[in-house]
């Protein structure tokens, strides 16, 4: 028996509902998605293997919401708060139900720390078609994620490799600090699946390369000027307190950015 098939037997022995549970374990070990106390939304959660792993890792202070068109059987004695939403993730009513569960954010983004998706299309055996359908599912999940994620939040979704992958990544990248491709060891050797891990949701009004006018309101401990762009903090090098200058955004983080004056 191959090591890949062995994951199926391990899942049965260890009480996981699907072998995909090990993929999420490996993704979390690699990318740090499921920290203690985080609020997690699992899209396309049935039968619940990813929910089992998420519940173990976010602990009693966490909140976990499983979303699927199918009924998800309740987890056995989970530590965190666990809720189930039966519905279409693209419908406003479904997103409203999620928000009712997790509440509103205190920050500039949504109320959720992590959105994960292991969804796959019904397979046709036609590689290009299956790839295109998987890309469409990721785009739908991405739309939900950008609506729900708080500043600094993370997004992880399965996609099949193919010709549209680069365009998909290019569309996701501006909304996060970075995006990487991860292929868990638990994926079958014959599978073209990979996971896009997008870290640190950006909700500020600026992006890398933007040129904006900034008034320096203070000087920080490191000597950089401190400006506000729509209440978003921008650190500007080589300026003095009280100056109003055009600056180019060099780097963007979830809660602040770095810039230099335009010469």
UniProtKB/Swiss-Prot annotation:
Record: residues binding S-adenosyl-L-methionine: 48, 50, 68, 88, 118
Active site: 158
Domain TRAM: 205-263
PROSITE patterns associated with the record: TRAM
Gene Ontology molecular function, alphabetical: rRNA (uridine-2'-O-)-methyltransferase activity
UniProt catalytic activity: uridine(2552) in 23S rRNA + S-adenosyl-L-methionine = 2'-O-methyluridine(2552) in 23S rRNA + S-adenosyl-L-homocysteine + H(+)
Subcellular location: Cytoplasm
UniProt protein name: Ribosomal RNA large subunit methyltransferase E
Organismal lineage: Archaea, Methanobacteriati, Methanobacteriota, Stenosarchaea group, Halobacteria
